[in-house]
Amino acid sequence: MREETRQIFLQTIDSDAGKRSIAEAMLMDLEKQPGFVMSLPHTCMKDGDPIVKRVAAIYFKNAIIKQWRSNEYSEARKYLVENILDLFLYGDEVTRTAYNAILVNIFNNEKLSDLDGMFRKAAGFMRTSEANHVLTALNMYERVFDAEKIKYNLEQVLGLMFDTAGKDILEKVYGFLESGNYGMVKTGMIVLSKSYCYYSIPDFLSAIGTFSYVFNLSLRILNLEGSNEDLLESKKWAAYFMYKSCSKGIKKFYKKSELSEYITDMNRFQMVYATFLKIIQERSQQTIDIELYAIDFFVLLTSDADFFRYMEPNLSYFISGYILPLYSLSDSEEDDFENDPDKYLREKYNFFGNGLRSSLNTLFCEIISKVKQKEETFQGIISYLLSILGGSKETPSRDNIRAAYGSFFLLASIKSTLMKKARNVLEYIVANHVIPALRGNSCILKSQACYFLSTIEEDLPINGLALEALDNTHKLMKSSHRALMVESTLAMSFFLFNEASSEKFRQLIPETVESILSLSNTYNLEPLTMLLDSIIGYYPEEISKYAPELVGSISRITLSHLMNESDVGEDKQMVVSGFLRSIESLILSLDQRSLVLKYSYVNSYDVISFILKEEKSDFYQEALDILNGYVYMIKEIEGSMWGLFQMVLNLPIDEITVYSTEVADLIDNFITYGKTSVMDAGILGSICSVISKLCLCNEENFLDEDFIGGCRIIESIILNIGNELLSKDPSRLPLFISVAISGEKMIDEDGPAIVYALELIMNCFILRPKETIRILREQKYLQSFFEKLFSQKNKFKRVHDKKICMLFIGTICRLQDGALPELDVHGLGEVLVATVTSLPEAIRLRNQMKDDEDAPPPLVNTEDDQCLDASDISCTDILEEDIYFETELDKFEPFGYISSILSSPASGTYAEKIISTMTDEQKDSLSTVLNGERIIQKI
């Protein structure tokens, strides 16, 4: 049997697809036999053939994780919880990988109370003198931090871990450090540093004796010399502990103030500072991971005035001896610029690629932010960086040019601070260093001069020099040097904002756009797509002249990127997304219903179709937004749009729920502009299927956002084709009402979803009052509906909401008294008065927003502004007015409608009854609005 099993495993990697398929099917069947799977650690996972061992280990891991909850594996599950540490103990590198995955699975799926035995066994291993036993225990502790679900209970887990083995962990790590066993030190430091990372830590770790022990251990490790790989890893985790501990101490995040006081003690903190300073002074390529934590530590110091004083004596070193040299042109960059410009550009503009420079940029900007109010210090740093540029200009030696390259980088990173605090300095840099560099002899400084220009997003008054800068930049666009072609094209963004050169720049827009598109065929550079988007936004009239051709070019380039399967990664995703956003921006800048729009749609059909047909899910949102934009702007449905629409409707439920808002917008637009064409059985069936997927699901999968999307689709159906649909198929009405009733039981009533649920029922009522009353009674929901409506009336804030309320109340007013014995007439009267009297102000607000729509947005500088955190972002629970939300109700005149009903109520109707219950004050309020000047909603 063992030989047969070996052959099956070998056949899973056979070059013959048929054999692979048969072997995989056999293994799937064998997976149902726990006895077979559990035999593998003692058979094939010990095989002499490394291929058999590896395949068997992978299969064992996957089978155990997949079947973990099945009844057939209950005994196997129990066995593994009790014996996984023993399996790991006697495993090797291959099998231990599988056992680690199972360990994480155990932590994710088993109750902590059921793992007590495992932790006690690990504690026993920690007390032995056998290194392999200790490694097994430490490895188990490390796996705790890989388990997502157990993290929610981490304080208890850490309590169990350190209550049973805390003292032994400390002693063993110290012992391994003494003996030079850095592999074990590394694992121990991972466990200790990650354990101290959390806000809530158990008593053992909170004890000052333990904390001081780990602190001194980390400090000692950081000061060790050597290039041993495990030692460097140990130092990395010691640096992590030290940085995190100092951060918690400075911010007073420790529950025990004693720990914060210990770590921030002046003498002790000075030792930490000196240690991190030594790390950056003695830096090497091997120690970059450690160095990054040192930089994080220094950034931390800039956040607090009391601790920044530690850095102040060394500011000159930080700028001139550390940051600038690492930003200066390196040998490899110089070689790439000349011989591999593709690599040079890729690394220069890859925002995620160079962690060291990114961290250094943060440190430099934080230092500038801290000293900008200290005039002498601030001016000293700026003067130093300018002197570097001046030295290169006067004596263009190789070393001076390299330093100037870095100085341009650093000055560009603080250009917003310079714009606010020292605008004259920025003007000086452009006039005296950027423009001379553009016309100079050094290609690499031309590159940096272009880079510097590309970062400035405000009008810089450099008078006639602006035209000279534009001419020189334009010449570089025609250069044969690929890097200079790209960077000079990007530098054209400077002239978007420069008034003095705006007319000349307009003439160069076609050439600039052509350069962007040509270069985008070769480079996955997001700044190119961002520049294109900016040109479209700032010069819509110029762009619209050849919009179809531009859309076609962008679509072809985007398709080529999408079809290139070998081209993967974040850069590609950002570039493709950027191009798709450019198409969307372009079509929204064109005149509605224009032929240019229709031609543009034809030219972008292929890329939208490809994304949907080939399931390029990373770009679904962009494709949906583009298609939505076309339908909304053209105001009719082009023939081929129906095919794209059907593809969207057929998306898997997981994708529809991710993009429920976009899908709802699209369906709304197709219904609005397609009208009764949507009533095609296939299309309508697919739309109703989407509604069911979004709204009629169990509570576990229910989301308010999805429910809102479904309600919006139903509302669009009712407002646009409601009568036609219900005349043809009355069974749709119960479906719509059931969506509201079932959803109302699961939504968050404090959020906006309740408004959609109530309005859905009101819309059904307006369209078919008697049938709606009957269905609500059958569902025993009529009374609840009115109670919800009255209690939630203050949430109907939008003009759209108030118009629905008035139509709904108007429909009730026409019913004969007695048709709704469940109705609280007085309560409905209050809703009527509140709605009518608040509607004029709501319309004024919406009209004002319409008038303000074209107001230019304020320019925002980011680098020295505070970043918004979650508390700064308002996520309102009340629906706010949205001028881009358009429906058939926009044309409805509500004041005349309700006035005609109330001014001469039919005898025996609810209108008569509602009026009779009103107070004189309520009647006067209504009269003032209905008989006064009527505010008309702008469309």
From Swiss-Prot:
The keyword Nucleus applies. InterPro entries: ARM-like, ARM-type_fold, Importin-beta_N. GO terms for molecular function: small GTPase binding. Pfam families: IBN_N (PF03810). Its main location: nucleus. Active in protein import into the nucleus. This is Probable importin ECU10_0620. The lineage of its organism: Eukaryota, Fungi, Fungi incertae sedis, Microsporidia, Unikaryonidae.
